[in-house]
């Protein structure tokens, strides 16, 4: 499945959404051996952030996903290579980027050799995994995880597809959410950038 996702083609279109302030973006995937496009994820205003009194975008399931299925691999500009994940998240360049509002920084195990690569997903393309928010501060739990290698995988039984016929609050179980980890939030505390700023996605 991971190899097929890597070789996928992606397309997207804006769809009118009467329950929100702006259209939502449906992202479609076509596998290497398929002729058909299928909805994969949806970028829309985040129901999680709304619950926290904030505004920003979030990532939703465009089709139903079940536990163990992969959505894609986290991509982004390579910031640097480090011996450990903590080294990556506490490096001087990481702090500089965070102070400039780059909050899509993720450390993943290096594809070639030991150590970790720090990726800045700020301008990454489809399937826009960097848009997934952390549910910290709400009563919601994560429904996906990011593996050491940077693959986003469903961890709860079933994530239903986003529906344009439902409100954002009614779609909240479709929003993809993962725990960024204590190291991520500890760094924001150290730098004086509060959690509210850190999780906001523009």
Task: Give each language-model segment a name.
Residues 1-19:
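Eukaryotic intrinsically disordered, low-complexity, charge-rich
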Residues 5-8, 136-202:
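C-terminal SET catalytic tail plus cysteine-rich post-SET Zn-binding segment of SAM-dependent SET-domain
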Residues 12, 39-42, 74, 153, ...:
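Intrinsic disorder/low-complexity segments enriched in polar/charged and small flexible residues
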Residues 16-17, 25-145:
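Catalytic cores of histone-lysine modification enzymes
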Residues 17-20, 72, 187-192:
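Short, flexible/disordered secondary-structure transition segments
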